[in-house]
Amino acid sequence: MAMQSLSPVPKLLSTTPSSVLSSDKNFFFVDFVGLYCKSKRTRRRLRGDSSSSSRSSSSLSRLSSVRAVIDLERVHGVSEKDLSSPSALRPQVANLEDILSERGACGVGFIANLDNIPSHGVVKDALIALGCMEHRGGCGADNDSGDGSGLMSSIPWDFFNVWAKEQSLAPFDKLHTGVGMIFLPQDDTFMQEAKQVIENIFEKEGLQVLGWREVPVNVPIVGKNARETMPNIQQVFVKIAKEDSTDDIERELYICRKLIERAVATESWGTELYFCSLSNQTIVYKGMLRSEALGLFYLDLQNELYESPFAIYHRRYSTNTSPRWPLAQPMRFLGHNGEINTIQGNLNWMQSREASLKAAVWNGRENEIRPFGNPRGSDSANLDSAAEIMIRSGRTPEEALMILVPEAYKNHPTLSVKYPEVVDFYDYYKGQMEAWDGPALLLFSDGKTVGACLDRNGLRPARYWRTSDNFVYVASEVGVVPVDEAKVTMKGRLGPGMMIAVDLVNGQVYENTEVKKRISSFNPYGKWIKENSRFLKPVNFKSSTVMENEEILRSQQAFGYSSEDVQMVIESMASQGKEPTFCMGDDIPLAGLSQRPHMLYDYFKQRFAQVTNPAIDPLREGLVMSLEVNIGKRGNILELGPENASQVILSNPVLNEGALEELMKDQYLKPKVLSTYFDIRKGVEGSLQKALYYLCEAADDAVRSGSQLLVLSDRSDRLEPTRPSIPIMLAVGAVHQHLIQNGLRMSASIVADTAQCFSTHHFACLVGYGASAVCPYLALETCRQWRLSNKTVAFMRNGKIPTVTIEQAQKNYTKAVNAGLLKILSKMGISLLSSYCGAQIFEIYGLGQDVVDLAFTGSVSKISGLTFDELARETLSFWVKAFSEDTTKRLENFGFIQFRPGGEYHSNNPEMSKLLHKAVREKSETAYAVYQQHLSNRPVNVLRDLLEFKSDRAPIPVGKVEPAVAIVQRFCTGGMSLGAISRETHEAIAIAMNRIGGKSNSGEGGEDPIRWKPLTDVVDGYSPTLPHLKGLQNGDIATSAIKQVASGRFGVTPTFLVNADQLEIKVAQGAKPGEGGQLPGKKVSAYIARLRSSKPGVPLISPPPHHDIYSIEDLAQLIFDLHQINPNAKVSVKLVAEAGIGTVASGVAKGNADIIQISGHDGGTGASPISSIKHAGGPWELGLTETHQTLIANGLRERVILRVDGGLKSGVDVLMAAAMGADEYGFGSLAMIATGCVMARICHTNNCPVGVASQREELRARFPGVPGDLVNYFLYVAEEVRGILAQLGYNSLDDIIGRTELLRPRDISLVKTQHLDLSYLLSSVGTPSLSSTEIRKQEVHTNGPVLDDDILADPLVIDAIENEKVVEKTVKICNVDRAACGRVAGVIAKKYGDTGFAGQVNLTFLGSAGQSFGCFLIPGMNIRLIGESNDYVGKGMAGGEIVVTPVEKIGFVPEEATIVGNTCLYGATGGQIFARGKAGERFAVRNSLAEAVVEGTGDHCCEYMTGGCVVVLGKVGRNVAAGMTGGLAYLLDEDDTLLPKINREIVKIQRVTAPAGELQLKSLIEAHVEKTGSSKGATILNEWEKYLPLFWQLVPPSEEDTPEASAAYVRTSTGEVTFQSA
């Protein structure tokens, strides 16, 4: 068995350079980790040292890890400062919208010496670790400018004293000297002005400037783009003689920095001045640099005298391709990996509390250090600022972060029982500070403490280890630093909400509970809460109606209700207790385009998480979420006291009338009711704006008079025709913003008492714009009226609807609203309503800027729209109906949800469907022309309807335009899963697309291999291979060219992946972005179950997020994985249009995607909550335009194909999309209609009348479609495209793609407003350097040389694969070797399929494996890892075996150590894994058929599992078996703590009593011991009778009757297991 060293990293890590920056030769050794972002220019600057490795030349060329030696003097001629001919700094425009678009993620870590002994080794190791995280960072369009990297350390005083001596300065007094690391303006004149301002303020504050130092940098190592914006980098040394306390000195330096920032804010160069650090304790070196370039750029870091006892390092991946130098990290306190989802609300609230933030330590100087946030900064920078003010005010870093980023302390049995004081701490601060919510691994230091904490959901990886020589390490990945395993005494990971802190002063390490218990003991928080907080107890619902029926009807009409709202929303929620589900998409006009009046809420679309942060599952992970609300004044967060706890606590924001009355009785709140009616007797013009002014003034007066509760109410004893109500959302937003601007917002809460709120979207809007709670009195009255109606009573009596009492109906409604709110929060990845409140996470379509600025400040509104007067008139259009003489006795049906004649226009209407069916079935050009005419005559429905084509060319003959057969190759169909639609529909669409050379999409759920070969047995249109289809031809092939990888990973096997032309990662879906899905058991037929590796009738849940995509670098990793197994398939990423999508798309392009698909909100779906269909996602016109233009501006457009979908129906739509930048065009609903869909809109019921969206065989038999119908449709569309191109004078689509100058606004009048602004759609930033055809024909993006290439280069391995032999091989591996074995598995799968390989490839790996180790493993592959692994082990494996064991000589107990990372076995469809140690979060998530044994796990073990078997021989985290609908789990419970950790919604918990179950458990443990040498497993087997009763078996309903789970099965005398009848 040959030993081959495939990675030089272990050798490099043990190498110590003999001289660093010595006088004769300046060699600097780094671990150069290359990825796709490595430029040829950089590689030319590096020369490999072949003597350091025994690797072959082919191995040396591998870029995943290359040892490099850089001769700095000879190659670069380094001088102290090289800023020759710097280009002018490009201005960075930033505002609140910028902050929402400046997203990113990273790789981070720290090294700390417990003895607090400074050394250069710490710095060097930190740089090596940083180099090993290059793959977690991003590069700019030049492939050379890093998105950012940096290092924080203690101040290297000995190093600086050498410089001081050279400058004839006295040695620095460590205690009284501060050091500033400063980015200064590029321009020399401005730089001198900046330095003068700095010196003047230091002098004014009594500080003495000791000297300025130009930081020596190596300019040529900087990428081209980064060099253009590179600042002057200098250090300033100042003496602080008036203070002796370190804390006072740091505070004085903080004041100086804030004064400097304020002083330069109005200067033209003000944004170019930035303090990386100004401290007596720490210093930060950072910049727009790649990982390996940091130490090469900053020559200081190479000097042996640069010593520190700790170092925090950070590598940034920004979605913004033009990141700024100041946004590199670490910040001044924090290094952040993740994204704060609530940043806009956090900034608003920080601004609000500025007036109240006071602390004695500031001696009255608080005004001088404001503001505490900066909208021009990133979320990380603002979180750092919030932590900084708290720390400088006297909090410890640990305490500050517990306040800012609290853990999910509710539903936490360990905390509540063992550490109640920690719960009290969190409860106290919950009312004072909203959580900064979102994925976050935060590393922190103030120079005395260094530590790390993780967000409440545990969404970023964090591993830590401690050694016997007193070093502590934390990192995003293991294997980044050279450590002797024999010295490692502790290995672990940070779980959700956990923290670790190293006290450098006292040499102590504090793990999670130790830290929190210590911090929580500082004050008697529990006592303060008990004595001051009031809990609003549940108040009974009213048992009868308050209003007469006529009065209810009038109120409903006045406030904008329709019969659909009452029947399909309110009554449905009252009856079912959940939000109603609907299907298809939102095909009515946007509210601003509609000819009908809309409620104000309809102009707002909910924003959602995609790529840069994940959505949350509110149903299965509700333990981390909370709707709790605190009412009352929020105190001064900087000074503690019992009075801050004086608030009223609500369990949720939905108040019934009685609860509101109780709240109004609270004497401490001093509630004030403010009426929201306005007077139109003097005319409509100006009336609404004037009323808002008076309302805000009244709110202002009330708060200044001591009111802590403002109730904005539209309740009235009698409605009056001339006194309509201000839309309650407008009132709430205006008051909220007014109080913020006047420094009063923290003094009072806002409650809406309103008739104009009934849907979950309405509640979300009110809370999102500032309301803490809502009393929906008219909706509750409507529930009561419904329950008391004769019709409802009769339905209940007949069993048509559930029987509920009047109180239960209102309770159901409230329950549904709360559940809907949780879902809306979770779409954005937000866990707490308190963080959502005021966060304004919406996008506005159709409101004017004056309205937005007053009430919805900072919200994105790109197309402007209604003015205040126009909004007033729209409000009145509802109001007058209530007082009209011809008012009907029933509510009007507006037709907003379902199509109805005379109602709102639906683009997918019956007439359109009939016309299309006639055209494609009769193959009639005339009929298609009628269909075209129908579309052209429709009302304005979408933004593109406001545009038309223009041209500067003369028309040309159609014959000169590219042929239809070329155009149709740009067409694709939507990702509709086999399960949501029938087999007949799915296959007919695929065959049609293959006939024309287009691409169909498999959707989620896999694909039958029978479809991958052309048909050869067709007779008279029928084939025995596909007997359920007609209209077939020999040569037809039913494979989907695009194979989808969705969050459930159903049907995703190695063979499925290698048989794809393209692989689509569905991040979001237009009709329900931010949500997952569930295929009901009734739709899971035997055929569907087989494809999805499940059982018939078992519900199959797709999680809201991909559990291997929590950030942008995670997406890059999945793209890498897919390119690994199928290097010939282009990888597409499907996004949904929303503001900021351009920067997200930039990150996706930098992540090596080949295709980016932009979906509009009007796309279809098989099933979704109505609120999601109607109120989430944006128009693709805006999303596509932003994406195309952002990619061009950042030099990335040539890298990716842009595809668009959502409501496309015609050639006009195709050409509009082309002019806005799309290369390819997707059709979903129209493809289904062309194949037979009649738009019955009952897809979610499984009752489709024509079998298009049903799994019922009798309905599927009615399927009318043939592939030829869809072929005809697309050919007609292509011919339409040709005709218009000819009229415009262009020869091909290539000629017009991205040419927005060919569009102009139509001369058209809208009913509501003439103030829409389409300039954004018509703007242009140029076109790509390559044509669309050239972009589409580019080769698949490559991963570059990888470890698997070296394995496959071994002739013995290839021989074993080709001839099904056995081969064994040992390979070294390190963390940069990612997706190891994925490509080998792909080669085998392509040749043999998922189960056909009879040989064996046995690989042993030595070291720390990178992410996705053993991904997509295939039967016959057996891999053993001696070492440890990072996240995603066994992802998508279909067979084979993975064994992970620690090295032989270790200093820790294996079963107590973490050996594999998070999200292992994700989507596995077979195989086994045995790990001697613990796993991280979400072990076996969505496991289908794999078996596993592990010795402990984090939270969410076995989540969404549908099959297989998992054995855990140690402790598990919370929420085990959430969403687990199949498979079995055996969990050892040695200390009787397991049961509270089980999610019991689905699974049954029982002891192991079935003989087959015992046999299964024991056999797996025996295999585990044999393969890993597990001492824990051996002990269990040796004492089996003792341990067996300690195991719990988790059994979902689908497994209850299996031999392993049912005691009804017994073992016979022959050893067989048989069923024992009663």
Curated annotation (Swiss-Prot):
EC number(s) on file: 1.4.7.1
Induction: Up-regulated by GATA21/GNC and GATA22/CGA1. Induced by light or sucrose.
Paired cysteines (S-S): none
Disruption phenotype: Displays photorespiratory chlorosis when grown at ambient CO2.
Compartment annotation: Plastid, Chloroplast stroma; Mitochondrion matrix
Catalytic-site annotation from UniProt: 106
One Gene Ontology term of the molecular function aspect: mRNA binding
Binding site residues for [3Fe-4S] cluster: 1237, 1243, 1248
PROSITE patterns per the UniProt record, alphabetical: GATASE_TYPE_2 (PS51278)
Boundaries of every Glutamine amidotransferase type-2 domain copy: 106-505
CDD domains documented for this protein: gltB_C, GltS, GltS_FMN
Family: Belongs to the glutamate synthase family.
Name of the protein in question: Ferredoxin-dependent glutamate synthase 1, chloroplastic/mitochondrial
Naturally occurring in which organism (per UniProt): Arabidopsis thaliana (Mouse-ear cress)
Organism lineage: Eukaryota, Viridiplantae, Streptophyta, Embryophyta, Tracheophyta
